[in-house]
Amino acid sequence: MPRCFQLPCSTRMPTTEVPQAADGQGDAGDGEEAAEPEGKFKPPKNTKRKNRDYVRFTPLLLVLAALVSAGVMLWYFLGYKAEVTVSQVYSGSLRVLNRHFSQDLGRRESIAFRSESAKAQKMLQELVASTRLGTYYNSSSVYSFGEGPLTCFFWFILDIPEYQRLTLSPEVVRELLVDELLSNSSTLASYKTEYEVDPEGLVILEASVNDIVVLNSTLGCYRYSYVNPGQVLPLKGPDQQTTSCLWHLQGPEDLMIKVRLEWTRVDCRDRVAMYDAAGPLEKRLITSVYGCSRQEPVMEVLASGSVMAVVWKKGMHSYYDPFLLSVKSVAFQDCQVNLTLEGRLDTQGFLRTPYYPSYYSPSTHCSWHLTVPSLDYGLALWFDAYALRRQKYNRLCTQGQWMIQNRRLCGFRTLQPYAERIPMVASDGVTINFTSQISLTGPGVQVYYSLYNQSDPCPGEFLCSVNGLCVPACDGIKDCPNGLDERNCVCRAMFQCQEDSTCISLPRVCDRQPDCLNGSDEEQCQEGVPCGTFTFQCEDRSCVKKPNPECDGQSDCRDGSDEQHCDCGLQGLSSRIVGGTVSSEGEWPWQASLQIRGRHICGGALIADRWVITAAHCFQEDSMASPKLWTVFLGKMRQNSRWPGEVSFKVSRLFLHPYHEEDSHDYDVALLQLDHPVVYSATVRPVCLPARSHFFEPGQHCWITGWGAQREGGPVSNTLQKVDVQLVPQDLCSEAYRYQVSPRMLCAGYRKGKKDACQGDSGGPLVCREPSGRWFLAGLVSWGLGCGRPNFFGVYTRVTRVINWIQQVLT
């Protein structure tokens, strides 16, 4: 508050009375002097003494003058100076018990709305003014009404001294207003006389000036809807005459609002934001999506309660109704579980947030208690595209907070698998708590759980502490981000003889010719062995020592599963690609040409009677994302003419690997489901898919095929081309590309260049021939620097690292 110096109204100075004679005359000894007229100043007779008095009091007077001057200056600079204020915006709602909602009040353009909103705004202003907040009042607005006892939605602005800004939180402001509503004051204000305001129903939220700007921009297309229980309410699309719209959604207080958004196009630039409030409050943002969101063509979003705001903003190139909106009110779901696990190591179940896969609610709190059968086991949580990491306690978790064994972890989205391993130290199990700390949420979280042996967490493999995954060890590929799986290796990507630790190449193991000193490479070739990096796992989960036993004409598994699904990998006839030669008809019967409107775009490979595999980056452009656009040709030789043996198919479904990242080309694989089955022939048949343990040896010669350009910058080839390339060690390739090569990639080519894939070959197959004569799919043409440049190899998607996803989609 201003501070002032209170000055006296008058100052009384001390005076000295001059003694008077009894007769009223002057000094008797001065008879000759005449008396001075009344009122005229008569100087004292002793003037020297008086001057000495002035001199004596001068320092005191100067000190007094200085003090007065200093006081005036302090008053001016400290008290008189205007205080710095900040505009604090609040948004909220209140219920009026003696008013009821009508359809007219739901339309902002109606006379009833304008009249009632003016009265309600006056009531709100009077309510604020009746508290100590009235000194700071700036402006207010009632912008909408809702169902039930009439609900008023409003905002108001207070100009608050800066030093008080933090003291007037929404909670404090609400308390002041509620106290006034509950008081017994005899005021004639309308909030006491005309409106019966429910104090318990008052909601105050923090807002900003920008929130009001966004709200005002939508008032030309403002739509209020009340959602009854059990009702699925379709919402009218945006008004294309405006640039933004707002859907104000409200339901019963004991239910949650759930919005479903489905994009109808793949190439729009519109933005849709959803808020956990009646208005577009940035601090209550749940999620925001842009550009038709190809990654999430359909999404369902939960509010924390009975209100939600959805705001649409037109893109640069807008289309009529680029999305469909619907809403319903749903009950709160319990998220408390107690589970007792069995003493086995396979996946035993899953935990998930309410209404998964819907976005979890901003009010989500889950508590899961899991009990293990003994302390021999630890608990593993398996996440998909979601991971946990430690976070400073003064920072909020934006994608969910996890509390596990007194450890605080924050969730975050990632395009990688992740496992959280929890060692058991107490027999009563572990409690896992998941909480949403802020309004911003994300897709529902689902986590699978299993047990692991604490003394041997990854039998035959390496436990990567960075992500909790079991990865192959000493196979020449750094699967763990810190590379520890490839350290201290005696025989990297080779077999180690037991007797003298000699290293021999894997193809020489179980080939009926002893290479180790005591023949250990030929032992246990007809019986089960512990599973490891290069052992083949049969369907009965037993493992065989022989490398690459699948489809070699010899049954190695006891259940014969290594020789199942072997109608693949055989060429129909015996007999671009930079540096390549023309192929013969039927030489590569799995080769596919992916076309749009008669134009070859990418290559691919047939892997089953209704499935073609290719590269995911072929579909990264919005204009190429719809499966309806594509036609797949099989048995084709020339692009400008049809052969008797070629057939064509439409694409019914398109699957991109969920971890595919456009910038890095990681997980660059896609599957196309054909509209009808393929009839195999001499010119059309599938290539063999490798097992996860299949070993493609560096230095091995393989082949790539396609209709791509025969030189960098050149036109695509009319005739199917083929070229042989050599598989390159992973560390050599990674070094050439400055360590941008992931474990899901492999390299092939030559140091001198010349032989390589090029533009138009993307998604085409890299195939390698096994001693059995069958061809296996080792890679898919993905990326590279130029075409056939020296010291830069071609980079391919490593099929063995994505085979689990492929099999999952196919089955």
Swiss-Prot record:
Biological function: Membrane-bound serine protease. Through the cleavage of cell surface HJV, a regulator of the expression of the iron absorption-regulating hormone hepicidin/HAMP, plays a role in iron homeostasis.
Chain ranges of the Peptidase S1 domain: 577-811
Annotated LDL-receptor class A domain residues: 445-477, 478-514, 518-555
Composition bias, Polar residues: 8-18
Record PTM: The single-chain zymogen undergoes autoproteolytic processing. This results in TMPRSS6 shedding from the cell surface and conversion into an activated two-chains form which is released extracellularly. The process involves a trans-activation mechanism that requires TMPRSS6 oligomerization.
Disulfide feature: C335-C366, C458-C470, C464-C480, C474-C489, C491-C503, C497-C516, C510-C525, C531-C543, C538-C557, C551-C566, C602-C618, C702-C768, C733-C747, C758-C787
Annotated region (Disordered), positions in chain: 1-48
Family named by the database record: Belongs to the peptidase S1 family.
Subunit structure: Interacts with HJV.
E.C. no: 3.4.21.-
Organism, scientific name: Mus musculus
Record has Disulfide bond as a keyword: yes
TM helices/strands, residue ranges: 60-80
Residue ranges occupied by any CUB domain in the UniProt entry: 213-336, 323-440
Biological process (GO), any one: intracellular iron ion homeostasis
Domain note: Cytoplasmic domain mediates HAMP suppression via proximal promoter element(s).
Tissue expression as described in the entry: Expressed at highest levels in adult mice liver, kidney and uterus. Also strongly expressed within the nasal cavity by olfactory epithelial cells. A weak, but detectable, signal in adult mice tissues analyzed including brain, lung, heart, kidney, spleen, muscle, intestine, thymus and pancreas. No signal in residual embryonic yolk sac, developing kidney tubules or in embryonic tissues analyzed including lung, heart, gastrointestinal tract and epithelium of the oral cavity.
Cellular component, GO, one term: extracellular space
Official protein name in the record: Transmembrane protease serine 6
